[in-house]
């Protein structure tokens, strides 16, 4: 039976704004009864953009506006120091929960606040069709003081775990790897006990750039495959690729004993269950430890149309499946993003145990 979403949409349009990691905006589905587990309305096949005016946001995707004391304090500090965060630039729906320490948009949580700092500026050289980060072929040069300023800011917040990410910088000889590495080293010098996760670009597959960053003192090397193999050219910038992303993660894992690696997959772009399972197996085959899965939400009508709204029950299925095939930690849910509660205690213990094991062997 044809879905009411399966009607002609506007022709494909390459997103005028794009990037790698942002995700969010208003996602909506029909106000009818919720579909069975693992099913949802689908748009036509193909790289369609635009929004269907007849669809409505499902209840499980509604999120209160971010508020709370920790959130307000962190937002003020980031603004004063002129730092970029993927939480803001990519319109992440979990900004309140992560910045408040796991307590939702405004409640009290476990106290583990996580902010993802975006280095190398706020302008990406690539134009992935899912992302809200702005793009340009010639972004401004990196701020040479950014590594130190970032380290000073993070050290002042008193956090034990920080995520550093970046836009793609194909305009730089090393893709920005050395700038990234300088930031990690500055953080470790100011606060040796802090755990640092780096969510990186693919550096155009440059293994030396990957090695440089992987050897900088970081604790978790993250790089996202974003979607299943068959949808790569539709979803990501042509300069990115499934096999190239796997090669990045494989090389990072080999750079240091005890290295924890991580990746993420968006659902709702038209992938099949078998394709998701294959992507998981491909990641496990190269030793990836941590996986996150979340719903793709369309940032603007110029970005890819949501083709499926995956139910919370199906996300729970994927969490259990991921654990069954060997991932050491799986975060799976409609609003989960790459850095979702990255620093929670289980992940911190996983990283520290890996360090202890590698140093004693």
From Swiss-Prot:
It catalyses: [[Fe-S] cluster scaffold protein carrying a second [4Fe-4S](2+) cluster] + N(6)-octanoyl-L-lysyl-[protein] + 2 oxidized [2Fe-2S]-[ferredoxin] + 2 S-adenosyl-L-methionine + 4 H(+) = [[Fe-S] cluster scaffold protein] + N(6)-[(R)-dihydrolipoyl]-L-lysyl-[protein] + 4 Fe(3+) + 2 hydrogen sulfide + 2 5'-deoxyadenosine + 2 L-methionine + 2 reduced [2Fe-2S]-[ferredoxin]. Binds 2 [4Fe-4S] clusters per subunit. One cluster is coordinated with 3 cysteines and an exchangeable S-adenosyl-L-methionine. One of its GO terms (cellular component) is chloroplast. Keywords: 4Fe-4S, Chloroplast, Iron, Iron-sulfur, Metal-binding, Plastid, S-adenosyl-L-methionine, Transferase. This protein may be expected to contain an N-terminal transit peptide but none has been predicted. [4Fe-4S] cluster 2 binds at residues 124, 128, 131. Residues 107-328 form the Radical SAM core domain. Pathway: Protein modification; protein lipoylation via endogenous pathway; protein N(6)-(lipoyl)lysine from octanoyl-[acyl-carrier-protein]: step 2/2. GO terms for biological process: lipoate biosynthetic process. It holds the Pfam family Radical_SAM. Gene3D superfamilies: Aldolase class I (3.20.20.70). It is found in: Plastid, Chloroplast. CDD domains: Radical_SAM. [4Fe-4S] cluster 1 binds at residues 87, 92, 98, 339. One of its GO terms (molecular function) is lipoate synthase activity. This is Lipoyl synthase 1, chloroplastic. Its EC number is 2.8.1.8. Belongs to the radical SAM superfamily. Lipoyl synthase family. Its cofactor is [4Fe-4S] cluster.
């Amino acid at each position: 039976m044809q879905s009411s979403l399966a009607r002609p949409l506007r022709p494909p349009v390459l997103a005028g704004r794009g990037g790698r990691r942002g995700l969010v905006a208003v996602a909506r589905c029909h106000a009818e009864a919720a579909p069975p587990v693992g099913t949802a309305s689908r748009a036509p096949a193909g790289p369609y953009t635009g929004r269907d005016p007849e669809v409505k946001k499902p209840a499980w995707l509604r999120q209160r506006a971010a508020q709370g004391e920790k959130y307000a304090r962190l937002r003020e500090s980031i603004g004063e120091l002129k730092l970029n965060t993927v939480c803001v630039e990519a319109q992440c729906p979990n900004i309140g929960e992560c910045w408040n320490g796991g307590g939702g948009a405004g409640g009290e949580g476990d106290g583990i606040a996580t902010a993802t700092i975006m280095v190398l500026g706020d302008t990406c050289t690539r134009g992935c069709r899912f992302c809200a980060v702005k793009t340009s072929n010639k972004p401004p040069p990196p701020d040479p003081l950014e590594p130190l300023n970032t380290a000073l800011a993070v050290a002042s917040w008193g956090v034990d775990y920080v995520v550093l990410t970046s836009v793609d910088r194909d305009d730089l000889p090393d893709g920005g790897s050395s700038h990234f590495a300088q930031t990690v080293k500055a953080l470790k010098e100011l606060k040796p006990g802090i755990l640092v996760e780096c969510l990186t670009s693919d550096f155009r597959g440059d293994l030396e750039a990957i090695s440089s960053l992987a050897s900088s003192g970081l604790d978790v090397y993250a790089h996202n495959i974003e979607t299943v193999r068959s949808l790569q050219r539709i979803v990501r910038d042509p300069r990115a690729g499934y096999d190239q992303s796997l090669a990045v993660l494989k090389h990072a894992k080999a750079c240091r004993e005890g290295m924890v690696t991580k990746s993420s997959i968006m659902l709702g772009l038209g992938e099949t269950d078998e394709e998701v399972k294959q992507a998981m197996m491909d990641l496990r085959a190269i030793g990836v430890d941590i996986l996150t899965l979340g719903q793709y939400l369309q940032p603007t009508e110029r970005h890819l149309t949501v083709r499926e709204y995956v139910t919370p029950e199906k996300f729970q299925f994927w969490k259990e499946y991921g654990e069954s095939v060997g991932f050491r930690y799986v975060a799976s849910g409609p609003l989960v993003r790459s850095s979702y509660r990255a620093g929670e205690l289980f992940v911190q213990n996983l990283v520290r145990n890996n360090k202890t094991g590698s140093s004693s062997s």
